[in-house]
Amino acid sequence: VNYRNHRKIVVIDGIVAYMGGMNLGQEYIDGGKRFASWRDTHMRIVGDACNLIQNVFVCDWHNAGGRDLDNLMDNGSSLMQELFPSSTTDKYLPMQIISSGPDSKWDSIQKIYSKMIADAKESIYIESPYFVPDDGFLHDLENAALSGINVNLMITGKPDKLVAWWVAQTYFETLLKAGVNIYLYESGFLHSKFCAIDGR
């Protein structure tokens, strides 16, 4: 069982957050010795959504055996106000933060992907370096393509993990027959995990 934490979260003063695929290290900026470049997606978030991202971090910290926050986290504590300050932004864009992990009994991310794909009206764009879907996700993509949705999948053309890359290719024939467009990113290593549905 793999219980490692693969999240990439930075929260600054409880009001600015960064999350996405970027690791910390020079090779993740310029590709290092193995790749000409490293393509990734990371987001900067400002506002109330930072509280939700901070909550994910605090739960991970607690579950990993970090400082016991239970006694410090009552609503009036200074630590609570420091970790979860009120937003000062006047701009608003609806956003939902979703996390999954061994601390949750629900596969929240998998469920939201299935729902979004099922609700797609025009297009689905997915980027992933390691495309190893379960049967349900594979069928979701096939059904979307067969129903006329423009489904596009991009994976890395220059892998860092050959086994995962070979496994991904075993799904190509089935997806192509269903009408999914598949692209290989050849300009360097594609590490981005990204999905856009109907341009959103």
Report the location of each language-model feature:
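Charged, low-complexity intrinsically disordered terminal segments
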Residues: 1-200
